[in-house]
Amino acid sequence: MKRTFQPHNRKRRNKHGFRQRMATKTGRKIISSRRAKGRHSLSVSSDMGSRRQ
């Protein structure tokens, strides 16, 4: 049987990336709360940027 999680980096970035978070009010709240907590990575795309060419 096929598993439900089929990972793809593009889909991951598009759904949970920084630009996607900033597009909604609740997304901005998530980013600000992660900043306040002192998270090393704010979103998926923010730590993918260095690896992507």
Curated annotation (Swiss-Prot):
By sequence similarity, the record places it as follows: Belongs to the bacterial ribosomal protein bL34 family.
HAMAP family (alphabetical) = Ribosomal_bL34
Q: Does the keyword Ribosomal protein apply?
A: yes
Which Pfam families does its entry note? Ribosomal_L34 (PF00468)
Q: What is this protein called?
A: Large ribosomal subunit protein bL34
Composition-biased stretches, type Basic residues, lie in 1-19, 26-40
Q: Where is this region: Disordered?
A: 1-53
Molecular function in Gene Ontology? structural constituent of ribosome
Entry's InterPro entries? Ribosomal_bL34 (IPR000271), Ribosomal_bL34_CS (IPR020939)
Superkingdom of this protein's organism? Bacteria
Keywords in UniProt for this one?
Ribonucleoprotein, Ribosomal protein
- Is the Ribonucleoprotein keyword given for this protein? yes
What is this protein's gene name?
A: rpmH
Q: What Gene Ontology terms describe where this protein resides (cellular component)?
A: ribonucleoprotein complex; ribosome
Protein species of origin: Chlorobium phaeobacteroides (strain BS1)
Q: Where is the composition biased (Polar residues)?
A: 42-53
